């Protein structure tokens, strides 16, 4: 996928509260939340921008990244995919 988000994947970061929220929402055990999310994003072929945010859908996860600052805002389970599995 050739877009600005993937070109700037190394700039993606989050806040301490963001790490806590994402770990809780995705039920992650890893301490390196940002790298986990970046790796998942790189695998996605469903990336789109809507307004000021990028949305990345991969498997059961949906990631939201601010388009200007590349801050990973949140991640959560994709309820549609989860119910279809």
Kindly give the residue locations of the regions a language model identified.
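Ribonuclease/tRNase effector modules and their secretory precursors
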Residues: 1-85
